[in-house]
Each structure stands twice: as structure tokens, then as C-alpha cells.
Amino acid sequence: MKITRRHALQGTGATALGLAGLNFDFSRATAQTNVKRGGTLNFAISAEAPHYDPHASDTYATLHLAGPFYSTLLRFNLEKFPQVEGDLAQSWQVAPDLMTYTFKLKPDVKFHDGTALTSADIKATYDRLRNPPQGVVSTRKATFGDIAEIQTPDPLTVVFKMKAVNASMLEHFASPWNVIYAAKDLSADPASPRTKINGTGPYTFVEHVKGSHVAGKKNDGYFKKGLPYLDGFKGIFTLQAAAMLNAVQGGQVMGEFRGISPAERDRLVQAMGDKIRIQESSWTLALLVCFNIEKKPFDDVRVRRALLMAIDRWGGSNGLSKISTLRSVGGVVRPGSPFATPEAELVKLPGFSKDIKKSREEAKKLLKEAGQENLKFTLWNRNLAMPYTPAGIFLVDQWRQVGVEVEHKQSDTGAYLAHMNSGNHDVAIDFTNLFMDDTSLGLSKFLSLSRSPENRSRSNDPQLDKLYDDHIRERDVEKRKALIRAFEKRLFEQAYQQQLLWWHRIVATHKTLMGWQMSPSHNLGAQLEGVWLNA
């Protein structure tokens, strides 16, 4: 079985597909004949971004703050997810051998400072993503490492030449993290996007008041005529779940676009009745148990495997799904998606046995062999109620049952990420934050630290790197699936890090909020260009 249908569409027919995406944008804008223009959308953001640069981030807080100010080359059509459509791209062609991607840009696009967008800006942005200069972090460096050269034959044409095939490269060009920066800004200061915003998106930056809110106003020069509908928006930081729920219930905010727990959903429905809209979906997001293998005793695979084997994921799923956004047991691929490991195979992997008594006996044996019968350590965690706090409490209890004593420490998002990124943690609750199910994205987090800054276990494993590289080149589905299984087996046997549980997304919005679209990823739809208020 070959991956042919999709790439046939993306090859010689890709230009037509690109134009269809363009037409879809405008038909969507004009089909809503009853749209009410104007007004300011107030919405909640449950964490504050550590900086403004999506290239260097893997937390939704950055996108929910900065997303409305930026555009990307392509994006996902949320009504037909995971189909891609043009954002800055007017059309595109993909060579049959998948080694050349040619994009034609929409004309008359301007950055918020009045500078005209050209192919040079696309090149500068993707050069920064694939080969960041010293002092700049690109968490997608591994993803775009297959780009050999970027050509700009004219101001509205950009050509990507590949070193090797990546069967999912077109979808990566639609990543919401790949916002386009101005070449002149990057030339003046490659690190400037961390603290300054100059995009081409539907809203222009007004202010960011730390601890309070971020505000944007309508971009009157937006290249998509008739959009956005709103006069502006205010993203209000509500770091405590109770405060966020009170704000939704009281009408101070129209919703929160990440997700809430089942109990929080039930509270809002009971209090607000038919005034609240509830949308639910499986989620391309999982929590991870992550060991820093540079710290003793976590440099010993026996200790790491023992701690994973002590966790009753199946029982935990049943309990945690009632009180948090955690739900599904799964491996490196989202449960239910095409490349997910079937349950019958998953239970054979370390940490996924349904016989928890036997598994914990083996865990105690491994700890004894490693001389760690009285192990004590600190679990580093994020101070978000959903679902980090219940996950941390759950893990502390699980490890207690094999004689391990754990101190549970939580901090806000900025400090949490800085602590892990600098390698100061012993064990942490990390996350895999995906915008699609494709494994070229999902597995990249687990590559060697030298290739992937997102790898907070700090492991370097050439065997995993080779399996990853082989799988992204493979166009035969069954062969690719086998490589994914081998990658997963190696990762879990070495126990560098492992999925705890996958999430379930529940979003609550006021019914007066229109045009917002649900998806399996809270990283998508952050531009807010099609949102309007029926009030």
C-alpha cells in the first residue's frame, strides 16, 4: 500500500488545490450574510507566554497571545481538517518526487509597519527555523532540517529544494508555529521576535500588560478583504481555573480556547443552560513522564523503567478522565489515529501492562538491582490545574506504592519551561503538543537533544534518530508503520520519556460567539479572523 492519493493531489494538481483554498477563504467570508461586524472579543488565556516567538515555543500560551498578529505560508482548513489551504500562499506546486516545493505568494500583503511582504521574508523565516543563528532557539529545527536550499526567483515566488524526501512536508508548511517574520527585522536582530511583534495577521499589536492581558486591534490593511470582523480582542490571563470559570459564567470573557475539565463543563452547563456552547473532541496532546538522564540515578535505565512500570495507566485513565482533561491510554501516536499502536500490542510494552500487581513487583525488583530501594526525588510540574495538578498528584501516589518518595513542585509556565530546558529537573511532567497526527511531527520531540531542543530527557540516541529518518522517507504505509513501532519500542525500552495519558478536549464558549471552529488541536485557529459577536 503506497501513500499516493494525497501526494497526487499535492503534485501536479497542487496549484488547483491551492487556488481552491484561496476561494474557500473568500467564500467563507462572504457566505455568512448575517455577520455582525465590530465589537471587541474578550477571551481567557489560562497561562501567560514566556515570550512572543512561536518559533522558539511549544506552549499554546504563545500562540494564543501572538497568533492573531501573524500569518503562515499555509494553514489547516479546520472545516476539512487535516486538508491544507493557503494563508500567504496563493498557490503551490509539489514536484512528483517531493524534492521541490514552489509557492506563489499573494500580492499586496504588508507587515504592520507598512513593509511589503516578499519571498525574501519567507526565506529569512524558514532559514531561521531550519538553521537558527547563535542565541536563537528553533524547536522545529529537526523538522526543517531536510531543506537544502531556499530560492527566491522573484518577489512573489519562493522555492524550497529538499535534501531528501519528507512525505509530510506540505503539512509542516501549514504549522501554526511557522509564523512569517520580516527579513529586515531578523537581519537587524535575529532574536527580536521574542520581545517585538510585527506580523501580517488580521490584528495589530496594541499592548501586553504582564499578569493582566494582551490586546490587539483590527488590521485595516489586512490582505484578506472584509476580514477580520471584530474591531479588536483582549486575551485576559486567568491562571486560576476558578477565576476563568467565574469570568465565563459572568460574561467577562466569551470563552477559553484551550479546554476545560468534565466537572468544569458540567458546572457551566448547570449555571448557564442554553447560553453556553460545549464542543468536544479527542486531542493531539499528551502528558509525558520525562527523566533527565544526565542526573543520577536517572542515568540508569533500570530506574527509569521501574518508575514507568509502577504507573497504572489503565486505572488512572478511568479515574482521571472524570476529574480532568486526561483520558486515553496510548503510545507515541494519538489513540485512534491511523498509525496508533493497537491495544493488544501496546500492553506488551514497558509501562502499559494491565497486570499492575505484576508490573509493580518487577519495578521493585529493578529498583533493588539498581540500589535504589529508598529512592527520593523531586517531580517538576506546571501550575496549571488542568490537567497538570491532578497528573502530578496521581504520579506521586503511584510511585509511593513501590516505596519511592516524591516531592511535587509546581511553577508558572515560564519558570517551568526554563527549568526543564536548562536541564535542572530530575523528573518532570512534560507534554507533547501537536497540531496534527503525522508522526514526522509527533516523533521529532524524542530525537537526540543535538537535533531536537524539545527533548527534555536530554538523551542522544542514534538508533532512534535513524528510525525517525527512515520513517519520514518511507512512502509505503505498512513499512512506515513498522518503523514507527520500532521507534516506539526503542523509546519505551530505554525509558527516556513516555506518554502518561492523552487528553480529551472540551471547549465552552458563549453562544453569542460565532465563527470560532473546533479542532483536535488547541494550537489551530488562533488568528481569530473569522470570529464575530452576535450581540
PLM regions with names:
Residues 57, 273, 331-332, 338-339, ...:
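Acidic-aromatic pocket-rim loops
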Residues 327-366, 386-388:
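Structural transition elements
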